[in-house]
């Protein structure tokens, strides 16, 4: 069997998802194929995977060779996925949010300030790029994006520096943008680079990540079978808050009830989830040592009860 990338919190995802033979699963973020491969390898089930990144095709073909008709891939984003799935329902759904290691490690994709490359950041390699945004948006819009999506308290100072710099030269590389940010706010103490929040914010904005997540969750009930499980791995507080609130709003509060009570339990049809991770799960210290990118991961899961 071919070797596959090991995704974040794989053992925890499999334990919560609990794949069973002859059931069908949806991997919403294929990436390098780690979750899809692990689910298919765990039992004789089928997996449908989604991804908007055209660069995943090599990994897609590898899984097709290993698993044949048990695996199906659809090139799409969250917003268009329901139309392309054509009302198909699944026994379990897994979502690994944010940018993949594969995308971060390719300099030409422009996601990371660790590599000097074109300032792109588009997951689908189509549409508005990060370079276009930082060179055309006004100062207030840039500041708002960095503050809203990066939780960056010094967003206005960064935005001012970006606008001042582009008066003399175009900002067309990850190195240039990172240097502008570091120069404007200085180096911060600790392990996190000063440019981290700005890069995160622009990437989220360019790819419409939070809006697409909200749209997918609003419709996920229609493609999840009864007793099916939804497992979500997020990597920053904005994503995690959306998932946490969605689970809370759609789940019944558990109340202790006497076994002698004769009244029938009424189920609110709007409360269709049961949370199966009362406390958010995080990576083990061993996993973080092996993969520092796992340090911010959070896993939440729920089961459809009606």
Curated annotation (Swiss-Prot):
Gene Ontology MF annotations: rRNA (cytosine-N4-)-methyltransferase activity
EC annotation from Swiss-Prot or TrEMBL: 2.1.1.199
CDD domains: AdoMet_MTases
Superkingdom of the source species: Bacteria
Transmembrane segments: none
Keywords: Cytoplasm, Methyltransferase, rRNA processing, S-adenosyl-L-methionine, Transferase
Cellular compartment(s): Cytoplasm
A Pfam family the protein falls into: Methyltransf_5
Cited HAMAP family: 16SrRNA_methyltr_H (MF_01007)
Protein name: Ribosomal RNA small subunit methyltransferase H
């Amino acid at each position: 069997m071919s070797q596959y990338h090991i995704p974040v919190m794989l053992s925890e995802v499999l334990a919560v998802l609990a794949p069973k033979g002859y059931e069908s699963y949806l991997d919403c973020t294929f990436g390098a194929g780690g979750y899809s491969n692990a689910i298919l390898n765990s039992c004789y089930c089928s997996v449908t995977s989604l991804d908007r990144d055209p660069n995943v095709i090599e990994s897609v073909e590898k899984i097709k060779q290993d698993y044949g008709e048990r695996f199906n891939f659809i090139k799409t984003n969250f917003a268009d996925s329901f139309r392309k799935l054509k009302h198909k329902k699944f026994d379990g759904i897994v979502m690994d949010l944010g940018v993949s290691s594969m995308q971060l490690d390719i300099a030409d994709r422009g996601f990371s300030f660790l590599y000097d490359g074109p300032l792109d950041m588009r997951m689908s390699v189509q549409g508005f790029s990060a370079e276009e945004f930082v060179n055309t948006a006004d100062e207030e819009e840039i500041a708002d994006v960095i503050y809203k999506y990066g939780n960056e308290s010094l967003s206005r100072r960064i935005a001012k520096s970006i606008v001042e710099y582009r008066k003399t030269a175009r900002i067309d590389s990850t190195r240039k943008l990172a240097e502008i940010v570091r120069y404007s706010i200085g180096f911060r103490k600790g392990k996190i680079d000063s440019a981290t929040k700005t890069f995160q914010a622009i990437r989220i904005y360019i790819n419409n990540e939070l809006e697409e997540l909200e749209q997918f969750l609003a419709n996920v009930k229609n493609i999840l079978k009864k007793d099916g499980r939804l497992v979500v791995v997020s990597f920053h507080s904005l994503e995690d808050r959306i998932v946490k609130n969605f689970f809370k709003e759609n789940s019944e509060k558990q109340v202790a009830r006497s076994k002698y009570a004769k009244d029938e339990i009424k189920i609110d049809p709007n409360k269709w989830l049961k949370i199966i991770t009362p406390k958010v799960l995080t990576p083990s210290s061993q996993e973080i040592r092996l993969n520092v990118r796992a340090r911010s991961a959070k896993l939440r899961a729920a089961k459809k009860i009606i």
